[in-house]
């Protein structure tokens, strides 16, 4: 009897509970998945790091006022001197892309600025949107009622849909809003326009700049984002305005931080503007709209 009991004990220990390999296999798969993600993030950091270092070095140089004044006054060779435009009363209109102004008391190379630059470059690197490719149908939120929608819900048939990403604390975005408003007024018969309010470029508790026209902290909730968007809506053109989600899904999909312009037509990205502040050029959008209008109506439009 003792031998039989001992043998039964040994056999019982060797069998183990049924399905014991299930949790182990799940844990192994999870470990492999996390390892792959870590490798992908490490590889992306290695690719982005030289670009980030170059930007950080440029910001450090621009903290020397003599360099800042010389560099910011110099016009980029790809952006020729703009044409002088007159309104109906013969008065000179402001340019589409006024030069970026940075006050002397603003430091550009700080921990907060480097965090913001890294965040923007990372979003641009991982964005889903590319010119000529399909437009990401990311989630947006209506400011009235917090109703969830999709970006392509605002596209109507084959009409182009212009996306304008930005926030109140972004000086170039706000400085060029009047030029964007002129385009909305001129082309809204054939083109749809949508402003997407994203996370603040220069929140009062982040990368602070005295050049920002408003003092707004980072959004902690959709209510905060709605309050900021209403400030923009007071002086915004007569086009639809929606909010990015608190997960920043649209800004991530389009690499839109700090600000950016896109044109979507029939679900395809027809124009992808550069990432702000340097690449945010309303004049480029105007050129695209003029060409589209010429193709549509056969005559070159007169500038406002």
From Swiss-Prot:
<dbReference type="GO" id="GO:0033798">
    <property type="term" value="F:thyroxine 5-deiodinase activity"/>
</dbReference>
<dbReference type="InterPro" id="IPR027252">
    <property type="entry name" value="Iodothyronine_deiodinase_I/III"/>
</dbReference>
<keyword id="KW-0812">Transmembrane</keyword>
<keyword id="KW-0472">Membrane</keyword>
<feature type="region of interest" description="Disordered">
    <location>
        <begin position="1"/>
        <end position="22"/>
    </location>
</feature>
<dbReference type="InterPro" id="IPR000643">
    <property type="entry name" value="Iodothyronine_deiodinase"/>
</dbReference>
<dbReference type="GO" id="GO:0005886">
    <property type="term" value="C:plasma membrane"/>
</dbReference>
<dbReference type="GO" id="GO:0004800">
    <property type="term" value="F:thyroxine 5'-deiodinase activity"/>
</dbReference>
<dbReference type="GO" id="GO:0042403">
    <property type="term" value="P:thyroid hormone metabolic process"/>
</dbReference>
<keyword id="KW-1003">Cell membrane</keyword>
<keyword id="KW-0967">Endosome</keyword>
<dbReference type="InterPro" id="IPR036249">
    <property type="entry name" value="Thioredoxin-like_sf"/>
</dbReference>
<dbReference type="GO" id="GO:0040018">
    <property type="term" value="P:positive regulation of multicellular organism growth"/>
</dbReference>
<feature type="transmembrane region" description="Helical; Signal-anchor for type II membrane protein">
    <location>
        <begin position="43"/>
        <end position="62"/>
    </location>
</feature>
<keyword id="KW-0712">Selenocysteine</keyword>
<dbReference type="GO" id="GO:0070342">
    <property type="term" value="P:brown fat cell proliferation"/>
</dbReference>
<dbReference type="GO" id="GO:0042404">
    <property type="term" value="P:thyroid hormone catabolic process"/>
</dbReference>
<dbReference type="Pfam" id="PF00837">
    <property type="entry name" value="T4_deiodinase"/>
</dbReference>
<dbReference type="GO" id="GO:0001666">
    <property type="term" value="P:response to hypoxia"/>
</dbReference>
<feature type="active site">
    <location>
        <position position="170"/>
    </location>
</feature>
<keyword id="KW-0560">Oxidoreductase</keyword>
<feature type="topological domain" description="Extracellular">
    <location>
        <begin position="63"/>
        <end position="304"/>
    </location>
</feature>
<dbReference type="InterPro" id="IPR008261">
    <property type="entry name" value="Iodothyronine_deiodinase_AS"/>
</dbReference>
<dbReference type="GO" id="GO:0010008">
    <property type="term" value="C:endosome membrane"/>
</dbReference>
<comment type="function">
    <text>Plays a crucial role in the metabolism of thyroid hormones (TH) and has specific roles in TH activation and inactivation by deiodination. Catalyzes the deiodination of L-thyroxine (T4) to 3,3',5'-triiodothyronine (rT3), 3,5-diiodothyronine (3,5-T2) to 3-monoiodothyronine (3-T1), rT3 to 3',5'-diiodothyronine (3',5'-T2) and 3,3'-diiodothyronine (3,3'-T2) to 3'-monoiodothyronine (3'-T1) via inner-ring deiodination (IRD). Catalyzes the deiodination of 3,5,3'-triiodothyronine (T3) to 3,3'-diiodothyronine (3,3'-T2) via IRD.</text>
</comment>
<keyword id="KW-0893">Thyroid hormones biosynthesis</keyword>
<feature type="topological domain" description="Cytoplasmic">
    <location>
        <begin position="1"/>
        <end position="42"/>
    </location>
</feature>
<protein>
    <recommendedName>
        <fullName>Thyroxine 5-deiodinase</fullName>
        <ecNumber>1.21.99.3</ecNumber>
    </recommendedName>
</protein>
<dbReference type="GO" id="GO:0006915">
    <property type="term" value="P:apoptotic process"/>
</dbReference>
<dbReference type="GO" id="GO:0042446">
    <property type="term" value="P:hormone biosynthetic process"/>
</dbReference>
<keyword id="KW-1133">Transmembrane helix</keyword>
<dbReference type="GO" id="GO:0097474">
    <property type="term" value="P:retinal cone cell apoptotic process"/>
</dbReference>
<comment type="similarity">
    <text>Belongs to the iodothyronine deiodinase family.</text>
</comment>
<dbReference type="GO" id="GO:0046549">
    <property type="term" value="P:retinal cone cell development"/>
</dbReference>
<comment type="subunit">
    <text>Monomer. Homodimer. May undergo minor heretodimerization with DIO1 and DIO2.</text>
</comment>
<keyword id="KW-0735">Signal-anchor</keyword>
């Amino acid at each position: 009897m003792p031998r039989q009991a001992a043998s039964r004990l040994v056999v019982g220990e060797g069998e183990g509970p049924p399905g014991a390999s299930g949790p182990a296999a799940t844990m192994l798969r999870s470990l492999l998945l996390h390892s792959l993600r870590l490798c992908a993030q490490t590889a992306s950091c290695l690719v982005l790091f030289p670009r980030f270092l170059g930007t950080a070095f440029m910001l450090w140089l621009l903290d020397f006022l003599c360099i800042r004044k010389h560099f910011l006054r110099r016009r980029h060779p790809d952006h020729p001197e703009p044409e002088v435009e007159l309104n109906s009363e013969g008065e000179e209109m402001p340019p589409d892309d006024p030069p970026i102004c940075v006050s002397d008391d603003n430091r550009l190379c700080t921990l907060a600025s480097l965090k913001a630059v890294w965040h923007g470059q990372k979003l641009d690197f991982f964005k889903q949107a590319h010119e000529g490719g399909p437009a990401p149908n990311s989630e947006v939120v209506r400011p009235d009622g917090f109703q969830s929608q999709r970006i392509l819900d605002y596209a109507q048939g084959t009409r182009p849909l212009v996306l304008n990403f930005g926030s109140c604390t972004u000086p170039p975005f706000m400085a060029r809003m009047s030029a964007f408003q002129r385009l909305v007024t001129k082309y809204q018969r054939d083109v749809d326009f949508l402003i997407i309010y994203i996370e603040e470029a220069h929140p009062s508790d982040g990368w602070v700049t005295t050049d920002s026209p408003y003092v707004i902290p980072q959004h902690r909730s959709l209510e905060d984002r709605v309050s900021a968007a209403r400030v923009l809506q007071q002086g915004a053109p007569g086009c639809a305005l929606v909010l990015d989600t608190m997960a920043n899904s649209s800004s991530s999909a389009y690499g839109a931080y700090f600000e950016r312009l896109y044109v979507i037509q029939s679900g395809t990205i027809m124009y992808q503007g550069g990432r702000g502040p340097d690449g945010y050029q309303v004049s480029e959008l105007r050129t695209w709209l003029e060409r589209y209008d010429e193709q549509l109506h056969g005559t070159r439009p007169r500038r406002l």
